[in-house]
């Protein structure tokens, strides 16, 4: 296991070192379980009480929390960001592939960049372009004329359909499907007529796509995922959706077709968003939101009924069903009061 001194960590993170810089760190742990040889972090002052019993060799914390800890410390403006950056330095996650496996099928005219690795039973079809240092896990399918940018990592059993473009330094988790048909049909006297989906999917650079997430290809134009977007597991992105830079989408979210989401948005888990609407930059939608109309102002938006006991919820649901009747009765009372005055 790699070791790094506290002084080296301070230098790489731009942190202020307090204590013995020669102490060696080999891993990161949560504050309550951290032991010798490990570093931990305090991201919120409300957890200061754990500092007194912390057994870690060092703690990343804010200057305001320093008086409450007398051990080795790295002082940072944002300890949680420090944790993220240090985790990257100490990352022990294996490669999704380490060489070109003999069982991989690679079309004769596919272009494979220097240092690329392709796992067992992966399929790289005609015209596909795999960039330098790309990792393609076992059992992946890369369709005709698909392009994967340099440094991207694709875990096992991912399907990337024909003509899809995946940018550089992307991460795609197992079971994701990029470029499958959008849900497009015409109706001919009660019978569904399939509309071939002639667009594709364009994914920018530094994008992360979670396990079992599906991103449909466009009907005519492309579905577009901009640079820096992070998408959690089990999300459905329908055809012709456009997602702006650095937007984050939590698990089980469903987006209908031709939705446009701006930059730097946060979409909570299990949110459902209607198609053919636009959400501006800087919008946060809390978990299980149901978005039926455009959002033109930045801010935090919520919908749904918070958790109650089943007994309370049944009463609330019964009252909700009577809102229209209650509204009519209220207007009638208001009218009578106005007439009497």
UniProtKB/Swiss-Prot annotation:
The active site is at residue 239. This is UDP-3-O-acylglucosamine N-acyltransferase. Belongs to the transferase hexapeptide repeat family. LpxD subfamily. Keywords: Acyltransferase, Lipid A biosynthesis, Lipid biosynthesis, Lipid metabolism, Repeat, Transferase. It catalyses: a UDP-3-O-[(3R)-3-hydroxyacyl]-alpha-D-glucosamine + a (3R)-hydroxyacyl-[ACP] = a UDP-2-N,3-O-bis[(3R)-3-hydroxyacyl]-alpha-D-glucosamine + holo-[ACP] + H(+). GO terms for cellular component: membrane. Its EC number is 2.3.1.191. Pathway: Bacterial outer membrane biogenesis; LPS lipid A biosynthesis. The keyword Transferase applies. One of its GO terms (molecular function) is N-acyltransferase activity. Homotrimer. Disulfide bonds: none annotated. It comes from the Bacteria. CDD domains: LbH_LpxD. Catalyzes the N-acylation of UDP-3-O-acylglucosamine using 3-hydroxyacyl-ACP as the acyl donor. Is involved in the biosynthesis of lipid A, a phosphorylated glycolipid that anchors the lipopolysaccharide to the outer membrane of the cell. GO terms for biological process: lipid A biosynthetic process. The gene is lpxD. It holds the Pfam family Hexapep_2.
